[in-house]
Structures are given as C-alpha cells and as structure tokens.
C-alpha cells in the first residue's frame, strides 16, 4: 500500500480510537476530543470526514476505532450522511496505537473489502484541526502525483519541542516536497 492521495480514486482511513485523556474534563474516555465541537459546528471527527470527502468518495472512507467509541463514530457520521455504511467502521479489539491500527485497517480493506493491495490510501487522524483546508487538499493532491512508490507524510514547522510528538528531518528541497 502507498499512503498518498488521488482525487476520487484513493481510499481514506481515519484514525479515531484515542482515549481523550489529555483534554480532560472536556474530553474523557467515553467521549474523546475527536467527538467535541471545538472550532465550529462540527466535531473534529466530522471535520475530518468532510475534509476526506474533498479527495475521496464516501464509499472509500473508512474509520478505525475501539468498541467503546463505535456508536460515537457512527452517530456523528449519521448526522452528516444518513446513508453512511457502518461496515466502513473498523473496530479494534484493543487500543492498538497508530501503526498496529493502520495495519489492522489495511488488512481489513484487502481481505474483507477486497481492495487491491496496490491502491493508494491516505491515513488521517480524526482529532486534528486544519486551518487552511483548501491548501491541505491541494497539498495531498499534489503529493499523490509525486509520491511514486514512496510513503509520504505531512508535517508542520514546530514552535517548540514536545515529547509527545515525532519529528521529521527534512532532506533536499524538491519544490514543496523534501527527500
């Protein structure tokens, strides 16, 4: 699988299994931050779904969450799309963290949904706020054209160090991309 984006042909996988403990008391285990309306009339999860629809048809958007949050995910998606199929919500048996959750979801896509293993998938966290959504969409579309057989990641310039984040060491500048 290549993790990238191609307008209306790729798959989107939205990670929404977090426990929400860092924003307590607003967010909590049974209602993590991805389900909160923090910036507008939509939750972070709903905003991610709407953003994914700009690059992916709805039937190719999948969610991975834990059993405790299945109904939170399903109910919030139903608010936006009454026809959303709950088969597009993959349930982790235990909280797996990012890499194992992505692996489980890709396995589900290939083995259960019968997605071609050569398909392109973009992996999106459900709890991020994207200020300039048009720029973000265009970045993903441009990345798809240039990704080749590589795995890509999108990052921002950090303002200060933080032990909870990973960091990207940029290589040689290639227009808007780096090796």
Question: Would you name each region that the model predicts?
Answer:
Residues 131-179:
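Conserved core of the sugar-phosphate nucleotidyltransferase
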Residues 7, 11-14, 25, 37-120, ...:
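Conserved N-terminal catalytic core of the sugar/cofactor nucleotidyltransferase
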Residues 126:
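Short acidic donor-binding/metal-coordinating loop in glycosyltransferase active sites
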Residues 23, 35, 45, 168, ...:
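Short clusters of hydrophobic/aromatic residues that line enzyme substrate/ligand-binding pockets
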Residues 25-32:
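Gly-rich Lys/Arg/Thr-decorated short loops/hinges at beta-loop-alpha junctions or inter-strand turns
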